[in-house]
């Protein structure tokens, strides 16, 4: 029984080491580093593609709030595909846009619009969500 | 035989024909035994006509001398494609099953060859069924290549090379269309949808050129089966001609499932290398793939029919020009289906063929009716539409347009964790309250849209949609619960000109 338990422990350790190495390799590529550095260096980051209607929708939300996001247009970069793959591994989605506020992942276009409509986005950004209220 | 006189004193043409009756081998001879040809032959025979039909020998991959009873749809189109779509869908289903309590412990393998064999068995079965349908209707089937040699004469070149001529009171062209390849250097290395449905080996890396439904469907199929797929298309979004909002969602779903999209990009060169087929894009990027599929369009199969020599008018694309009754400028020659390049869908060819049989032999002249023809794109998840897109509605509007949309994460996804929204949309003419367009992108879209198409065909109003009780819980019920207007598009009258 003890032997069985020790074998189980060894297997568990091997699995854990494998998992950690997988995560760290996924997380330590130059593209993953770029993603992490970008989202930690800017208040609002949108990973986007210039032609994508959903990206345009997300950008328009920030325009409504008089905020200027830092936009990474993946289709205009040589390493766009690799960044998108790294982004997919980090947030679990391959689609664009992916929006980050203060280093935290907000989500895609629908999540951004929902957060805007509920007032949550304005709260996250520390701004007034209703332009008319400022008049 | 006494000539009948009409009220206005003209000679009844039918009676005159009977009086000077020419003996023909057939009342109708059909060239092409695909969906339209078989339907026209059977229904004409049911009206009492003596019918002959010819078709090229069977093979899954077509050429100018290869075809098969059943035509594109059955042998190398809709049917085998849908079988592959079903096959590809299981990959995602297995992923989704985990959160529903299904423990899949062993490695799951996909065997392309097994599915391919099952697909081939099925199209052979259907090919035989179509032959039996013709035989049961007493239609005489000839295997060989048909061409028109006169207003009432068809020549069939049989497999052994011998040519036999048949005379017919009416000739129907139902030869369909075939996939075309753009003239890019190295195009001979690429395949079309014909070969894509019959590949010996599964492509681990696939490149698809084209933005139409065939391109999008094959990108979905191969990706669903585990291939790396790059899709290149000229526009910003795939599926030109469909509703823009739906196009955007299809693009997003393709990308979400791992297809690499290359909008506003074409291919400039293909070369064979040890690693595979090397492709250079219009942006100068290099890609290597096992298979390159050109899905850039189809053209009518009319080149070898000798039609122009007989005086039948063709358009610039080689399509047979016909009137509303599917009749050419030569009164004894008619054409239906893709060969006429109207709406190139199997059910439309069937409708045209039915109308032809009623007109030519049923004593009931019938025009084909092209409004509210529903169609689907079997990407994963599928898109289905009927009536006008938002853009078409705005273009054709005589008053304000109301757009109702519902976007939601389907119930199934809330458990599986799949991030994939369904979008449903109704376009309403405000003045009449009529629903003039409906579209859906999401699971079961095609199954749901067929019912919606009936409603639109009947002229249903938004109020009637709203008063219909939904089936709960279902995605379909969203079509009868869209209460609030997403947007109103005000009518802008076209500027008047003196031109």
From Swiss-Prot, chain A:
Disulphide bonds in the chain: 52-55
SUPFAM superfamilies named among the record's database cross-references: Thioredoxin-like (SSF52833)
Cell compartments where the protein resides: Cytoplasm
Residue stretches making up the Glutaredoxin domain: 32-132
One Pfam family cited in the UniProt record for this chain: Glutaredoxin
Keywords noted in UniProt: Cytoplasm, Disulfide bond, Electron transport, Redox-active center, Transport
Domain of life: Eukaryota
One of the record's GO cellular component terms: Golgi apparatus
Coiled-coil positions: none
Predominant location: cytoplasm
Family: Belongs to the glutaredoxin family. CPYC subfamily.
Entry function: Has a glutathione-disulfide oxidoreductase activity in the presence of NADPH and glutathione reductase. Reduces low molecular weight disulfides and proteins.
Protein name, as recorded: Glutaredoxin-C4
Organism of derivation: Arabidopsis thaliana (Mouse-ear cress)
Gene symbol of the encoding locus: GRXC4
Swiss-Prot record, chain B:
Organism: Arabidopsis thaliana
Record function comment: Catalyzes the reduction of glutathione disulfide (GSSG) to reduced glutathione (GSH). Constitutes the major mechanism to maintain a high GSH:GSSG ratio in the cytosol.
Catalysed reactions, as listed in the record: 2 glutathione + NADP(+) = glutathione disulfide + NADPH + H(+)
Any one GO molecular-function label of the UniProt entry: NADP binding
Main location: cytoplasm
The protein's name: Glutathione reductase, cytosolic
Annotated catalytic residues: 472
Record localization: Cytoplasm
């Amino acid at each position: 029984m003890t032997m069985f338990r020790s074998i189980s422990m060894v297997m568990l350790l091997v699995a854990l080491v494998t998992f950690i190495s997988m995560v760290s390799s996924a997380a330590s590529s130059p593209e993953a580093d770029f993603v992490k550095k970008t989202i930690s260096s800017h208040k609002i980051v949108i990973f986007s593609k210039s032609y994508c209607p959903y990206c345009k929708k997300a950008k328009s939300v920030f325009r409504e709030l008089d905020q200027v996001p830092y936009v990474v247009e993946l289709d205009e970069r040589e390493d766009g595909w690799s960044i998108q793959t790294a982004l997919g591994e980090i947030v679990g989605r391959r689609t664009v846009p992916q929006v980050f506020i203060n280093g935290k992942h907000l989500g895609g276009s629908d999540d951004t619009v929902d957060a805007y409509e509920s007032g949550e986005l304005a709260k996250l950004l520390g701004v007034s969500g209703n332009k008319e209220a400022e008049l | 035989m006494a000539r009948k006189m009409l009220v206005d004193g003209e000679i009844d043409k039918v009676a005159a024909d009977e009086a000077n009756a020419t003996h023909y081998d057939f009342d109708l001879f059909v060239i092409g035994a695909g969906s339209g040809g078989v339907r026209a032959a059977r229904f004409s025979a049911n009206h009492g006509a003596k019918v002959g039909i010819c078709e090229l020998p069977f093979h899954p991959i077509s050429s100018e001398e290869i075809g098969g009873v059943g035509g594109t749809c059955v042998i190398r189109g809709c049917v085998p494609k849908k079988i592959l779509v079903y096959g590809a869908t299981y990959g995602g289903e297995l992923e989704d099953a985990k959160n529903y309590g299904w423990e899949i412990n062993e490695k799951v393998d996909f065997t392309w060859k097994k599915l391919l064999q099952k697909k081939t068995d099925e199209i052979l079965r259907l090919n035989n069924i179509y032959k039996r349908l013709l035989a049961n209707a007493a239609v005489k089937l000839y295997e060989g290549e048909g061409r028109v040699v006169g207003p009432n004469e068809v020549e069939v070149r049989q497999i052994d090379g011998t040519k036999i001529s048949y005379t017919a009171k009416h000739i129907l062209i139902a030869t369909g269309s075939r996939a075309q390849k753009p003239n890019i250097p190295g195009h001979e290395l690429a395949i079309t949808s014909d070969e894509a449905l019959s590949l010996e080996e599964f492509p681990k890396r696939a490149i698809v050129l084209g933005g139409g439904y065939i391109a999008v469907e094959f990108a979905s199929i191969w990706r669903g089966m585990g291939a790396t797929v790059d899709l290149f298309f000229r526009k910003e979004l795939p599926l030109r001609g469909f509703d823009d909002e739906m196009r955007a969602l299809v693009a997003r779903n393709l990308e979400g499932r791992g297809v690499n999209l290359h909008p506003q990009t074409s291919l400039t060169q293909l070369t064979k290398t040890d690693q595979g087929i090397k492709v250079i894009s219009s942006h100068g990027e290099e890609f290597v793939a096992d298979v390159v599929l050109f899905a850039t369009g189809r053209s009518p199969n009319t080149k070898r029919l000798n039609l122009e020599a007989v005086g039948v008018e063709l358009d610039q694309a080689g399509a047979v020009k016909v009137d509303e009754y599917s009749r050419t400028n030569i009164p004894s020659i008619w054409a239906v289906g893709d060969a006429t390049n109207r709406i190139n869908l199997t059910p439309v060819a069937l409708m045209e063929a039915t109308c032809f049989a009623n007109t030519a032999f049923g004593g009931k002249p019938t025009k084909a009716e092209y409004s509210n023809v529903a169609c689907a794109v079997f990407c994963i998840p599928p898109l289905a539409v009927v009536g006008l897109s938002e853009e078409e509605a705005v273009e054709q509007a005589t008053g304000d347009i109301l757009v109702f949309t519902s976007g939601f994460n389907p119930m199934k996804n809330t458990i599986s964790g799949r991030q994939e929204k369904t979008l449903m949309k109704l376009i309403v003419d405000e003045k009449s309250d009529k629903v003039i367009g409906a579209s859906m992108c999401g699971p079961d879209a095609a199954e749901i849209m067929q019912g919606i198409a009936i409603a639109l065909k009947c002229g249903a109003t938004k109020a009637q949609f709203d008063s219909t009780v939904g089936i709960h819980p279902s995605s379909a019920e969203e079509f009868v619960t869209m209460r609030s207007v997403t947007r109103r598009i005000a009518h802008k009258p076209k500027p008047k000109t003196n031109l």
